[in-house]
UniProtKB/Swiss-Prot annotation:
Belongs to the tropomyosin family. GO terms for molecular function: protein homodimerization activity. Tropomyosin, in association with the troponin complex, plays a central role in the calcium dependent regulation of muscle contraction. Expressed in striated skeletal muscle (at protein level). Signal peptide: none annotated. The molecule is in a coiled coil structure that is formed by 2 polypeptide chains. The sequence exhibits a prominent seven-residues periodicity. This is Tropomyosin Per a 7.0102. Residues 1-266 form a coiled coil. Homodimer. The lineage of its organism: Eukaryota, Metazoa, Ecdysozoa, Arthropoda, Hexapoda.
Length: 284
């Protein structure tokens, strides 16, 4: 009888121990489930952060592409401005050459006019000298008349030459006026071109400043991309670690659940054994 009591006490103690272990296993399973849920929540949070970082990276890359496109446009504008400046310089050079040729033609026409005027003056003086002498000699008069006719002929020729020179001079003066007008227009154009050059210079300086700013922004974007890439790698590493932790916790939960099932089966076996023992005692 004492042996039965001892056996019953031992079985009861083993039952209590089994219950304690079962409760402990259940608590450990609950704790493991909580840790697993927490790890899953952290993994979801990390996944959201990774998505946000990827979105930030996409936006930064898009901004960098826009900055590069604007920089290309500014380079094209700078090249166009340089081409315009070169064309304007060529036009100024052509205007200056045209003005020099007009001045040369004017100087030539003025010299020819002076020569014609001098010849006409000499003929007129000779005619007046011959008329003032009043020679009685007919032959001398004839000679003088012939000389006069010749002088008149020369004067007429000189007049014709003078008229021709005057006409050419008028043409030259007209050309000169047009040249002066072109020169004035050229000077105005030069002033306009100088103003355009000044504006272009300011634009070039502005473009250089914009290019420097764009380069600085590009460096900042590169640094941001580098930082975001580092953060992305770190987040991926944390996500992988969290995933491994979840898998490890899931294995621990499975193990504890298996152990709990085993303890429950063991507890059921002890209960069945106690029932059989009580039945035997009652039968005795």
């Amino acid at each position: 009888m004492d042996a039965i009591k001892k056996k019953m006490q031992a079985m009861k103690l083993e039952k209590d121990n089994a219950m304690d272990r079962a409760l402990l296993c259940e608590q450990q399973a609950r704790d493991a489930n909580l840790r697993a849920e927490k790890a899953e929540e952290e993994a979801r949070s990390l996944q959201k952060k990774i998505q946000q970082i990827e979105n930030d990276l996409d936006q930064t890359m898009e901004q960098l592409m826009q900055v590069n496109a604007k920089l290309d446009e500014k380079d094209k504008a700078l090249q166009n401005a340089e081409s315009e400046v070169a064309a304007l310089n060529r036009r100024i050079q052509l205007l200056e050459e045209d003005l020099e040729r007009s001045e040369e033609r004017l100087a030539t026409a003025t010299a020819k006019l002076a020569e014609a005027s001098q010849a006409a003056d000499e003929s007129e003086r000779a005619r007046k000298i011959l008329e003032s002498k009043g020679l009685a000699d007919e032959e001398r008069m004839d000679a003088l008349e012939n000389q006069l006719k010749e002088a008149r002929f020369m004067a007429e020729e000189a007049d014709k030459k003078y008229d021709e020179v005057a006409r050419k001079l008028a043409m030259v003066e007209a050309d000169l006026e047009r040249a002066e007008e072109r020169a004035e227009s050229g000077e105005s154009k030069i002033v306009e071109l100088e103003e355009e050059l000044r504006v272009v210079g300011n634009n070039l300086k502005s473009l250089e400043v914009s290019e420097e700013k764009a380069n600085l922004r590009e460096e900042e974007y590169k640094q941001q991309i580098k930082t975001l890439t580092t953060r992305l790698k770190e987040a991926e590493a944390r996500a992988e670690f969290a995933e491994r932790s979840v898998q490890k916790l899931q294995k621990e939960v499975d193990r504890l659940e298996d152990e709990l099932v085993h303890e429950k089966e063991k507890y059921k076996f002890i209960c069945d054994d106690l029932d059989m023992t009580f039945t035997e005692l009652i039968g005795i």
